[in-house]
């Protein structure tokens, strides 16, 4: 597929049974459990082990296996470092990493060094050096990593990709995207009954993501979650495959949303009402590409708002904007020549349905119930099928490093009043001749 390490050398270090992929999980929280569910529904996967110090989450993951008629996974739950013992197991081919962001680097690098293929959940890096580490370790060990960005597989996004590849948008000029999602109920809870949004605690007093994710809003100020927005544009603009991201500039608004949420739900006397939040409510990042396109990302998760990732794809002959969560009718579209220069929007519905990506047409029924409207099926299916077929991942370690780098670079830019930051070429020039093979057929 699309990685830049030759596919013929990807898996030659493994004693590998292509009929059944033996998979383990580092972290089986709410996101990890989605992958557990998808893997448990497959006959070509054996779930070997879970590494997670949280017995409640491990119990939930084991229930998923039981529900799907699978045997219990071996558990490595003796503290934060027990995952290292799991990685010693020679009967594991691949590992899903779905841990808190600050653990991604340690877990991903350790898994590759242990010879385990990595499916890495997405976020942003803590430091730029981490991004280089992913690339260097993958190249040195020959162990591949797939970036698990599910929005690349969203149905409307893939239909637009299909139209882009058919030339309907002409030459692409500009794109926007982001993470525009009211996360306040995710960032705070009571920590008592496992329900998001039922309180205003975070950190050690909280449950699930609020235990760790909210601290990033307290201590950082940047584009914390770039991959949902940049990933789909990346596939349409051939980033790292004939094109690349060159530089960025970021700005952050004031921070008001989280404080107001705490006061409204917990009162002005609540201790967390005194917390000073560094993360701006709205962070915008403008990116310049080698081939002349521009990209604007928006991080907007601390204020009241409906869900919308804010996609815009604009070319010399077409324009699409979305305003919802991925339904076919939740967008506007315009093609100058086809619409006879009418200067009037058309609903995206008929266009999304007519140009539905062949992969969605073929696998729609398999995707039912797979999470996030079915796109998680396609994401996880690609991971497994590439391993089984000894093919390189279409979203690879170079893509992960590129996307992850946006976060620390945006933090630096904001701290320097929007100063332009150069985005490294993590491919070391290989992007010039690499080919885009993301979703090029109806298979995976």
UniProtKB/Swiss-Prot annotation:
Cofactor binding note from Swiss-Prot or TrEMBL: Binds 1 NAD(+) per subunit. The NAD(+) cannot dissociate.
Keyword Magnesium included in the entry's annotation: no
Top-rank EC class of the record's enzyme: hydrolase
Binding locations of substrate: 179, 213, 225-228, 307
UniProt catalytic activity: Cleavage of non-reducing alpha-(1->3)-N-acetylgalactosamine residues from human blood group A and AB mucin glycoproteins, Forssman hapten and blood group A lacto series glycolipids
Residues where NAD(+) binds: 30-31, 52, 80, 101-104, 107, 121-122, 150, 208-212, 225
Biotechnology: Specifically cleaves the blood group A antigen at neutral pH with low consumption of recombinant enzyme. It is therefore a good candidate to participate in the development of universal red blood cells by removing blood group A antigen.
Recorded GO MF terms: alpha-N-acetylgalactosaminidase activity; nucleotide binding
Effect of pH on activity: Optimum pH is 6.8.
Tagged with keyword Hydrolase: yes
One Pfam entry name: GFO_IDH_MocA
Family recorded in the similarity comment: Belongs to the Gfo/Idh/MocA family. Glycosyl hydrolase 109 subfamily.
Record's protein name: Alpha-N-acetylgalactosaminidase
Organism of derivation: Elizabethkingia meningoseptica
